[in-house]
Amino acid sequence: MYIGVISMRYAKALLAYADEKGTEDTVYEEAGILADSFSRIPELRQALDNPVLPAETKLKLICEAAGGGQVSEELKRFVELVLEERREKFLQFMIMSYIDLYRKQKNISVGKITTVCPVAEEVVSRIRALVVEKTHGTVEFKTKIDPKLEGGFIFEIGTYRLDASVANQIKRVKQQFIAKNR
C-alpha cells in the first residue's frame, strides 16, 4: 500500500474516534505538538523506525514528544494501535493527515506573514479579520522574521502568496533590465 492511503485511513479513523469522544480539539493540539517534534527532532523518527526498540519505549517517546507525557487517552490508544499493527514508520504522515482533515472539517486556514521586523499584534489582528471575512472560517497565523527581505512582507495563506518584499521588487527590476539588454 501507499504511504498516503495508509496515513489517510488511520487519520480518518482517529478523527472519527476523537469526534465520537468529543476530544478532537485536544487531539488536534497534541497532533500539532507531535508534528512539530517530528520536524525539530529527526532522532524521534529514527527511534520509531528502530526494530530493536520495544513498543512500550516507542509509546513513551511519542507521548513525551506530544505533550510531555500527558496525552489524551484517544491519542494514546491510537498510537498503541499503530505500534501494534507495526505501522509506526507512517505515524508522522498519519499525524499530518489528521491535522489536514481536522482543519478541513473545522474550516481553518493557515496563514504566514514574513517580515523584516516583528509585526504589531494589532496589524496581525486586522489581517486575520480580513482573511476571516473572505474565507468565512478560522485563521491560524504564524509570523516569521527574515532579514533577507530588506523591507516589506510576504503573506501566504493556503496556496495564495503575496510577495511585497523589497528583495522581490529588486529582483523583478533586475530581471527587467536583463530582459531589455539582451
Model-predicted regions and their roles:
Residues 1-182:
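Elongated, mostly alpha-helical coiled-coil "stalk/stator" tethers of large membrane protein machines
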